[in-house]
């Protein structure tokens, strides 16, 4: 357990908040921002429930976020404290560390980001980096991200980095690119139809000690998608093909093989009534940080 002084941290944040308010007057010098989320659990013995001993009577999940923006530039830092993690969260989170930070520049058609990357390709069947504090999930990449819109209706994305695994970054490399074209706006600008096609490629290069020598170190994923909407009707789908990797079968045996994901959906959104239908099929369809199969959160 690291020696974090949380009360001192709260005082520092309060002082910083006052500084932020003072800086609001000087908008030409940029804009500071900050947030503090702190969650606490207090635990005690309960003979009726059979809880005879409590290892940690107090636990906290605390997150301090600081940001600064100036014209087209944005910068951010996030400091996490799990002293220790609250019950229900993996003990792998224990500790306190400055885990995430980023620098970002946004232009008219181009966005560049270095540091912590949160991104999603398509519907997120294979590639989605996100933070869900309530569930103890954060699989952000530490690397780089490019978003480019060379023409109206055309979007290209590129990501590269190493994924976060609890309080460390895994010795794994993730590379990916995604492209989408809005054919509706390009071919039928006056029709009001949305017709977009897209696809992406994601590669995971597992260089960790968790890598199983019987499995390929490199896992490749290819996907295509289609979205169509007109008036009250919408439909679409996405298909993902995955190269060979380890996975659990229905009997919890470790298998090795290719995978695929299929997502189809349709909907009607009329005044006073709505209808939607979704079909999903998954076969070895997830992409984990590494070949360690015993933790669902990574």
Language model feature labels by segment:
Residues 100:
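Phosphate/ribose-recognition catalytic cores of enzymes acting on nucleotide-derived substrates
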Residues 118-120:
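Extended assembly-interface regions of large multimeric machines
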Residues 114:
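Conserved, mostly hydrophobic/aromatic
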Residues 1-4:
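N-terminal secretory signal peptides that target proteins for export/translocation
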Residues 24-32, 37, 41-60, 69-75, ...:
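Signature for the C-terminal beta-barrel architecture of outer-membrane proteins
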């Amino acid at each position: 357990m690291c020696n974090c002084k949380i009360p001192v941290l709260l005082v520092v944040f309060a002082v910083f908040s006052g500084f932020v308010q003072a800086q609001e007057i000087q908008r030409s010098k940029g804009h500071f921002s900050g947030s503090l989320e702190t969650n606490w659990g207090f635990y005690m013995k309960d003979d009726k429930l059979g809880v005879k001993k409590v290892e940690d009577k107090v636990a906290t999940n605390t997150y301090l976020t600081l940001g600064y923006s100036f014209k087209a530039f944005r910068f951010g830092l996030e400091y996490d404290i799990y002293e220790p993690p609250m019950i229900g969260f993996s003990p792998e989170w224990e500790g306190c560390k400055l885990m995430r930070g980023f620098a970002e520049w946004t232009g008219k058609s181009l966005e560049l980001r270095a540091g912590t990357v949160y991104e999603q390709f398509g519907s997120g069947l294979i590639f989605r980096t996100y933070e869900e504090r309530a569930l103890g999930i954060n699989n952000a990449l530490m690397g780089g991200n490019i978003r480019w819109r060379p023409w109206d209706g055309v979007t290209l994305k590129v990501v590269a980095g190493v994924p976060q695994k609890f309080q460390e970054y895994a010795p794994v490399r993730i590379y990916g690119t995604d492209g989408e074209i809005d054919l509706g706006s390009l071919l039928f600008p006056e029709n009001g139809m949305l017709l977009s096609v897209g696809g992406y490629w994601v590669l995971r290069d597992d260089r960790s000690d968790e890598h199983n020598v019987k499995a390929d170190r490199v896992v490749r994923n290819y996907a295509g998608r289609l979205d169509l909407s007109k008036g009250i009707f919408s439909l679409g789908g996405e298909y993902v093909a995955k190269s060979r990797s380890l996975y659990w079968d229905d009997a919890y045996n470790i298998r090795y093989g290719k995978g695929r994901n299929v997502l189809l959906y349709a909907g009607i959104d009329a005044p006073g009534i709505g209808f939607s239908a979704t079909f999903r099929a998954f076969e070895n369809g997830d992409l984990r940080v590494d070949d360690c199969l015993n933790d669902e959160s990574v």
